[in-house]
């Protein structure tokens, strides 16, 4: 009986000490290889810290509102069609990736699209823009030719909206 109690105490002590030394959910892990690529109508950022910030804060207050109208994968490009209120002097889009490819079949990865607008006048009209991502240029170079990305499903998320039944994230595959 003493032996059972002794092992129970040891087990409890080990469990508690492991729980106290485990990683804190808010601990910031630095991205070892952040990457920024400026394109004609968007900026592509591979940055896990920024990705987590966007994921945590996604809302109309965090990203200026816009809609993702359509996402298509055409050959080695992804076309993200967005619409947003007209009347802004500047509309900058960021495509944010954390660099993670989920090991599933087919593999999956997630992207956020964020809009920053400036000098806006109220308007009922909408502008449309297509953000064309050259997947080979960005992902294959970053992942040293990782063949998994050729077949990956990309889940594209709007940083100005929280996901719910009417605002689902949009998956797109090469099929």
Q: What are these language model-derived features?
A:
Residues 1-5, 24:
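Positively charged n-region of N-terminal signal peptides that target proteins for export
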Residues 4-14:
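Sec-dependent N-terminal signal peptides
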Residues 18-22:
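C-terminal motif of bacterial Sec signal peptides marking the signal peptidase cleavage site
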Residues 25-85, 91-92, 175:
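Acidic/polar, low-complexity intrinsically disordered N-terminal segments immediately downstream
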Residues 74-125:
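Mature extracytoplasmic domains of secretory-pathway proteins
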Residues 91, 129-131, 163-168:
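Short beta-strand segments
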Residues 114-151:
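Short, solvent-exposed, Trp/other aromatic-anchored flexible loops in extracytoplasmic proteins
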Residues 140-175:
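Surface-exposed edge beta-strand/loop patches
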């Amino acid at each position: 009986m003493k032996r059972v109690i002794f092992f129970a105490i040891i087990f409890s002590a080990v469990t508690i000490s492991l729980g106290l030394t485990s990683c804190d959910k808010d601990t910031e892990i630095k991205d070892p290889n952040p990457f920024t690529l400026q394109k004609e109508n968007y900026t592509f950022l591979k940055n896990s810290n920024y990705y987590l910030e966007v994921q945590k804060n996604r809302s109309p207050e965090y990203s200026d509102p816009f809609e993702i109208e359509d996402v298509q994968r055409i050959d080695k490009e992804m076309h993200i069609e967005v619409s947003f209120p007209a009347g802004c002097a500047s509309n900058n889009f960021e495509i944010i990736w954390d660099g993670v490819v989920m090991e599933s079949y087919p593999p999956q990865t997630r992207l956020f699209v964020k809009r920053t607008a400036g000098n806006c006048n109220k308007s009922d009209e909408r502008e449309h823009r297509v953000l064309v991502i050259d997947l080979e240029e960005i992902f294959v170079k970053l992942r040293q030719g990782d063949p998994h990305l050729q077949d990956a499903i990309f889940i594209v998320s709007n940083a100005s909206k929280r996901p719910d039944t009417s605002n689902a994230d949009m998956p797109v595959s090469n099929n």
